[in-house]
């Protein structure tokens, strides 16, 4: 995937602290995004030492333009300045999910059934952490992916990153 952004809702960089930080950011920012008329596709918070990156993915019918990202960035920055949920330096990035869109929720996985995906787990499952194959759908709290002729049920809570693999057929 090269330099393409690949993300999942829960980062384990600092364990539970990052997860609860991410949940706090989601609760704070999703209403802002939705209030501007966009879908909050997902939020990623990555702590990298003294500097962090906060990424907000937005979507809407017909696609996202740079002006859309700018509008969300302005509003999100204002809320973040007032609420101050991140104590360290950070960079705010707002973008569309893109063609290789990250998948964050069971609903997103279900709606992209039939597409090729790349999934990375936090810890190995059946001896592996990386899965690339056909997204079959979801079953309860598991994502079903077919790799070669073998079907894997991957618990959504164990997924670190998941992305659609764009098809150019």
UniProtKB/Swiss-Prot annotation:
<keyword id="KW-0963">Cytoplasm</keyword>
<dbReference type="Pfam" id="PF17384">
    <property type="entry name" value="DUF150_C"/>
</dbReference>
<dbReference type="InterPro" id="IPR003728">
    <property type="entry name" value="Ribosome_maturation_RimP"/>
</dbReference>
<comment type="function">
    <text>Required for maturation of 30S ribosomal subunits.</text>
</comment>
<dbReference type="InterPro" id="IPR028998">
    <property type="entry name" value="RimP_C"/>
</dbReference>
<dbReference type="Pfam" id="PF02576">
    <property type="entry name" value="RimP_N"/>
</dbReference>
<dbReference type="InterPro" id="IPR035956">
    <property type="entry name" value="RimP_N_sf"/>
</dbReference>
<dbReference type="GO" id="GO:0000028">
    <property type="term" value="P:ribosomal small subunit assembly"/>
</dbReference>
<keyword id="KW-0690">Ribosome biogenesis</keyword>
<dbReference type="GO" id="GO:0005829">
    <property type="term" value="C:cytosol"/>
</dbReference>
<protein>
    <recommendedName>
        <fullName>Ribosome maturation factor RimP</fullName>
    </recommendedName>
</protein>
<dbReference type="InterPro" id="IPR028989">
    <property type="entry name" value="RimP_N"/>
</dbReference>
<comment type="similarity">
    <text>Belongs to the RimP family.</text>
</comment>
<dbReference type="GO" id="GO:0006412">
    <property type="term" value="P:translation"/>
</dbReference>
<dbReference type="InterPro" id="IPR036847">
    <property type="entry name" value="RimP_C_sf"/>
</dbReference>
